[in-house]
UniProtKB/Swiss-Prot annotation:
Domain text: The Q motif is unique to and characteristic of the DEAD box family of RNA helicases and controls ATP binding and hydrolysis.
Family according to the record: Belongs to the DEAD box helicase family. eIF4A subfamily.
Translocase in keyword set: no
SUPFAM superfamilies named among the record's database cross-references: P-loop containing nucleoside triphosphate hydrolases (SSF52540)
EC supergroup of this enzyme: hydrolase
Lineage: Eukaryota, Fungi, Dikarya, Ascomycota, Saccharomycotina
Keyword DNA-binding set for record: no
Location of the Helicase ATP-binding domain: 53-223
EC numbers: 3.6.4.13
Motif (Q motif) on chain: 22-50
Protein name as it appears in the record: ATP-dependent RNA helicase eIF4A
Length: 396
């Protein structure tokens, strides 16, 4: 499977590190990593990989601003695998992610790219058996991918010994720091060896993220995509003025009458709205799955697998799941509610066109939402057009 990336023009990247490597063969990687990279479907590095893998494998602190669909997960996966001492049975790399789903996806990428290496990886996440965590740490698992709460708990209980950790990677740092994990993350930082390398990936650079860079990073290499380039290429963005909340559902049904879509993700701002919309759509005979943070992990896994396999055509989700829904065939994202946090907009609509695939995002905008939509346009230097009457043609 060949991987395509959203093209990023070199002129849109600001960096204080000038070494750009255009081939995986020139990155001085272990031969079995290169074998795993090609086996996974990568042919040449994406823009972020060309610039970030080398400084990370050299042990430098790195701050990379990259959105979904740019190959950022493989960037730190490849780098972590390169830095692991395969003979040392102890945790050497810690990767934090804001959601369980994202942590499991990262674990999956590490497993695939590290297929030909003797490296162990474990996901330490909430909603799973603590016994599995304890056994993994006792066995000397080398890479841990986890969510902040569970990881901190394991460190506090002294099952996770941090003395051999040489790499700390934070993915979606902006989301983690704004989601109430800040204190746990700071506590984790303080329990790691002082010499630990820090790699931070974030789609946006709010104050919380910049604060971490000054407190915990040492002269980091910065690779920043300019803000006005952050909206994913290939996503057509539209809005429908629904005037008021009560009109949204009828509008959604009308929309489905006029388009033919394989699969869609619909985002709502609250769990209660997700449940309300699911019930209403099922009553209209739509095949719908719903997913939110309060569901048990096993249910969430089942629902995601159903959606990936195509047995469910519509996935309704809250913002927590905006990061980590990796479904290749999604061609339409509907923001039933505009996100309350404008920085989440990119993560929602980015689902529709991962790795350069085209996608359509449709925003339902009430009269009260117009101001927020203008803020989103300004924040991303983008334009959200009114939905044309011939919208169906985009899906033929």
């Amino acid at each position: 499977m060949s991987q395509e990336f959203n093209e990023i023009d070199a002129n849109t990247i600001e960096t204080n590190y000038d070494n750009v490597v255009y081939s995986f063969d020139d990155l001085n990687l272990k031969p079995n990593i290169v074998r795993g990279i090609f086996g996974y479907g990568y042919e040449s590095p994406s823009a972020i990989q060309q610039r970030a893998i080398l400084p990370i494998t050299e042990g430098r602190d790195v701050l990379a601003q990259a959105q979904s669909g740019t190959g950022k997960t493989a960037t730190f996966t490849i780098s972590a695998l390169q830095r692991i001492d395969e003979n040392l049975k102890a945790t050497q790399a810690l990767i934090l992610a804001p959601t369980r789903e994202l942590a499991l996806q990262i674990q999956n990428v590490i497993t695939h790219i590290g297929l030909y290496l003797n490296v162990t990886v474990h996901a330490s996440i909430g909603g799973t058996s603590m016994k599995d965590d304890i056994e993994a740490f006792k066995s000397g698992v080398q890479i841990v991918v986890g969510t902040p709460g569970r990881v901190f708990d394991m460190i506090e209980r002294r099952f996770f010994r941090t003395d051999k950790v040489k790499m700390f990677i934070m993915d979606e740092a902006d989301e983690m720091l704004s989601s109430g994990f800040k204190e746990q993350i700071y506590n984790i930082f303080r329990l790691l060896p002082e010499t630990t390398q820090v790699v931070l990936l974030s789609a946006t650079m709010p104050q919380d993220v910049l604060e971490v860079t000054t407190k915990f990073m040492n002269n980091p290499v910065r690779i920043l995509v300019k803000k006005d380039e952050l909206t994913l290429e290939g996503i057509k963005q539209f809005y429908i003025n629904v005037e008021q909340e009560d009109f949204k559902f009828d509008c959604l049904c009308d929309l489905y009458d006029s388009i033919s879509v394989t699969q869609a993700v619909i985002f709502c701002n609250t769990r209660s709205k997700v449940e309300f919309l699911t019930t209403k759509l099922k009553a209209e005979n739509f095949t719908v799955s719903a997913i939110h943070a309060d569901l048990p992990q096993s249910d969430r896994d089942t629902i995601m697998n159903e959606f990936r396999s195509g047995s469910s055509r519509i996935l309704i989700a809250t913002d927590l799941l905006a990061r980590g829904i990796d479904v290749q065939q999604v061609s339409l994202v509907i923001n039933y509610d505009l996100p309350a946090n404008k920085e989440n907009y990119i993560h929602r609509i980015g689902r529709g066109g991962r790795f350069g695939r085209k996608g359509v995002a449709i925003n339902f905008v009430t009269d009260e939402d117009v101001g927020m939509m203008r803020e989103i346009e300004k924040f991303y230097s983008t334009q959200i057009e009114e939905m044309p009457a011939n919208i169906g043609e985009l899906f033929n």
